[in-house]
A protein has these predicted regions:
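Gly/Pro-rich turn-and-neighbor structural signature
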Residues: 53, 61-64
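A residue-level signal for conserved active-site and pocket-lining positions in enzyme catalytic cores
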Residues: 1, 33, 65, 145, ...
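Structural motif corresponding to the C-terminal cap of alpha-helices
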Residues: 41, 67-69
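A conserved hydrophobic secondary-structure block that centers on an alpha-helix together
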Residues: 2-56
Length: 376
């Protein structure tokens, strides 16, 4: 249930999760409230309760604030974000009371430049059972600076971009875990809408334990990155045609070092938009990695097709294959907006596993969802 009451935006999901194996049936709850304050700013709160993957209790509480103004230094738009979240669980691995996450960011976008800085602190015991935390026990510092002047002296060139993006992640003792520096010395936007870019990326990683970086289905030769202090540099070249074209193409090629080896990656996307009723996209990426611990290749291909029968009735399809899991996934979704604000979703998901005789279906599920807006 979601909606607006006065100055408040409210969203609630309450679900009963059925018993599965050793897990009993339980209730899962998510609630979110925001309120507009000042001219364009908001303050909000978030609560989740339940753990669909265990019988342990889990509670998450959070609050956030976003400040927006278009009058910073009289001419600029300024965005300031701040948030704080904490979890509490009776799981034996997370019983040290509230485990907090907090952070904030400042964004200053303008016609000729962009500036963004942010930081985040994640406690060791942070455990959002209704979400996920890619890394815990870390502090993350981030910044991005871009200069993007319009070019009026060249008829064929519209804009040039120069940028720097940096990320620095430490543990809670401020010891480096990983870092990334991405420099864009050349990014040209032509009057045709086509673009080319060149980027240089320097990365560092200090893993405290050996970790598996590659494991293919049926492959006993896992590839591990040993404990160490790694630093490497890569180059990235890309171009893409204008989004105004019926037939669009994008290609990115990256090359260089990777941990104590090398990695190259080719990614291509071809998009066809002949009319407002149909669109299709084919994408393919090929990644070759050579490491002292072993070499491997990763291929990923996908096909997306969207059919708009009418403005109110659409059919979208996604097919994806990768050679690591040797699996093919299919997602098909029908959406019918039978009246303004009221929709019916019919979703079909299938997964196939590649075997010697061809693809064999391993899983299929169908979901029917109703969504409606009520005004009162």
């Amino acid at each position: 249930l979601s909606g607006r009451v006065g100055d408040y935006n409210i969203g609630v999901i309450d679900a009963v999760v059925g018993a599965n194996g050793d897990l009993d049936s339980q209730n899962a709850f998510v609630g979110r409230v925001t309120r507009e304050i000042l001219d364009q700013s908001t303050v909000g709160a978030l609560v989740t309760h339940g753990d669909p993957n265990s019988d342990y209790d889990n509670l998450l509480l959070g609050t956030d604030f976003q400040y927006l103004t278009n009058k910073f230094l009289n001419n600029y738009r300024l965005e300031v974000n701040a948030f704080a979240v904490a979890t509490e669980s009776d799981h034996p691995d997370f019983q040290d009371g509230l485990a907090p996450v907090f952070g904030g960011s400042v964004v200053l976008p303008a016609d000729e430049f962009d500036i963004e800085v942010g930081l985040m602190h994640v406690d060791d015991n942070f455990n959002p059972a209704m979400g996920f935390a890619p890394r815990t026990g870390v502090r993350r510092y981030y910044t991005r600076w871009a200069y993007k002047p319009l070019i009026e002296s060249k008829d064929w060139l519209r804009q040039v971009y120069y940028s720097y993006e940096g990320e620095y992640i430490t543990d809670l003792s401020n010891q480096l875990q990983s870092s990334k520096h991405l420099i864009t010395p050349l990014h040209l936007l032509f009057e045709s809408g086509d673009q080319i870019l060149l980027e240089i990326e320097n990365s560092a990683d200090v893993p405290g334990n050996d970790f598996r970086i590659y494991n293919a289905a049926g492959d006993e030769n896992d590839v591990f990155i040993p404990v160490g202090d790694y630093s490497w540099t890569r180059g990235i070249f890309g171009f893409q045609t204008s989004s105004r074209r019926k037939l669009q193409f994008q290609h990115d090629y990256s090359f260089g070092d990777f941990y104590d080896g090398t990695r190259t990656e080719d990614t291509s996307e071809l998009t066809y938009l002949p009319s407002k009723h149909f669109g299709a996209e084919i994408s393919y990426s090929n990644q070759d990695v050579e490491l002292p611990a072993g070499d491997f290749n990763i291929k990923l291909a996908s096909l997306t097709a969207l059919i708009n029968f009418t403005p109110d009735f659409t059919w979208s399809n996604v097919v994806q294959y990768d050679n690591v899991s040797d699996s093919l996934g299919v997602n098909s979704r029908l959406i019918w907006e039978y009246r303004p604000g009221a929709r019916i979703f019919l979703v079909l998901n299938q997964s196939y596993l590649e075997e010697r005789t061809g693809f064999v279906r391993k899983q299929m599920d169908t979901t029917l969802k109703l969504s409606s807006i009520f005004r009162f």
